[in-house]
UniProtKB/Swiss-Prot annotation:
Record entry for activity regulation: Inhibited by the C-terminal non-catalytic region. Activated by caspase-cleavage. Full activation also requires homodimerization and autophosphorylation of Thr-180, which are inhibited by the proto-oncogene product RAF1. Activated by RASSF1 which acts by preventing its dephosphorylation. When autophosphorylated at Thr-180, recruits STRIPAK complex and promotes PP2A-mediated dephosphorylation and inactivation of STK3.
Protein kinase domain boundaries: 27-278
Catalytic activity: L-seryl-[protein] + ATP = O-phospho-L-seryl-[protein] + ADP + H(+); L-threonyl-[protein] + ATP = O-phospho-L-threonyl-[protein] + ADP + H(+)
EC identifiers of the protein: 2.7.11.1
Disulfide bonds: none
Acidic residues biased stretches: 309-321
Name of the featured protein: Serine/threonine-protein kinase 3
Biased composition (Polar residues): 381-390
Organism expressing this protein natively: Homo sapiens (Human)
Matches recorded under Gene3D superfamilies: 1.10.287.4270, p53-like tetramerisation domain, Transferase(Phosphotransferase) domain 1
Inducing or repressing factors: Activity increases during mitosis.
PROSITE patterns listed in its UniProt record: PROTEIN_KINASE_ATP, PROTEIN_KINASE_DOM, SARAH
Major subcellular location class: cytoplasm
Amino acid sequence: MEQPPAPKSKLKKLSEDSLTKQPEEVFDVLEKLGEGSYGSVFKAIHKESGQVVAIKQVPVESDLQEIIKEISIMQQCDSPYVVKYYGSYFKNTDLWIVMEYCGAGSVSDIIRLRNKTLIEDEIATILKSTLKGLEYLHFMRKIHRDIKAGNILLNTEGHAKLADFGVAGQLTDTMAKRNTVIGTPFWMAPEVIQEIGYNCVADIWSLGITSIEMAEGKPPYADIHPMRAIFMIPTNPPPTFRKPELWSDDFTDFVKKCLVKNPEQRATATQLLQHPFIKNAKPVSILRDLITEAMEIKAKRHEEQQRELEEEEENSDEDELDSHTMVKTSVESVGTMRATSTMSEGAQTMIEHNSTMLESDLGTMVINSEDEEEEDGTMKRNATSPQVQRPSFMDYFDKQDFKNKSHENCNQNMHEPFPMSKNVFPDNWKVPQDGDFDFLKNLSLEELQMRLKALDPMMEREIEELRQRYTAKRQPILDAMDAKKRRQQNF
């Protein structure tokens, strides 16, 4: 693969002159890197400086308000630990957002490409840069709201940078607390799920989950339905490693300090930078070998894919003659970066399997559309609903609603998805908010068995209530959007 020329000068911001030209006059687009929030991401070269950049191309029918918010947040940031923003263009029906290029891809990409989880030294080094990025954002009164391995990018030197601000938010004096569910369910803080308002330390919980993800290859609860996960995260004790004995006391304590359920008692980014696990982190040079290995694997797979495409073109005539016996499997055979759904018990080795995790496949950002069978990146958005910014797991609520309606059509006696009285569970059966379960010791065996038997229907009822609350909030927005579209069509 031909290497880009060395940069003539470091690009800091696009000049006014550059911004008045067509983007093709300013950049040479080289290749597609993957899918980001709202659009496709491409690798390109800035002709004047020779610098490699990333360009996100966003269709204008996407939610422009959300895109403008993302650009606004990026534009205000000037930190070596946050992906830089250079400028934007409108080209035909697309908005081009020019950003800093991180050649090694996301931490999630690297884990999948190498089929290996990370060791403690690598995790500590990545976390140190990530915490510096969070410290900067939080000082600027910004919440990222979607911290995970898929949104931590590495450049070829090993410097980690925060990316994908599609759901980030600005804290203001008039809106110091948020009460909307935004993010990806497995990484979400309990207070975010409970919609009781949250602030910057919600990112710290997500960082703790990301630490486990880097160590074990997936976040806690990844093997269960996301709807169940959002019930379990606020009610269960904070998650920890599946095999705590494999990890040092410092690392275990760091994760424990991130995963404190009470946000008022949770450590801040500044405090965590003083934690022994982070203070003893090694320099970024220790990441170079794993980055080189991942990039070599990626290049090899790209070459294999190109070779297979060429072979398919050569054999296309034969395929047409014998179309009933030919089955194309190019995507499957190339083995592009797929999210893994299960982990082997072997030390630090991740094995790829077919999806056993419904449709989430740990997809970072949003679940794929139904017609996509393979995931080729770590930053996917649902192609069927680009207009509305909403958490990924809410797709399951829509499916549950559809399923309930199907039951109504099949059986007129099944009108309620959960046929139970609201008062079937006494108030004292509710899970304590402080997570103190000592009271269970005083219950009889029969009471414990009854409580255990009641948990599933209780959970299903609470999930249904959450779905109904979300639908009640979402429908007026959709109605207003439809009304605006109809008015625009009348012009």
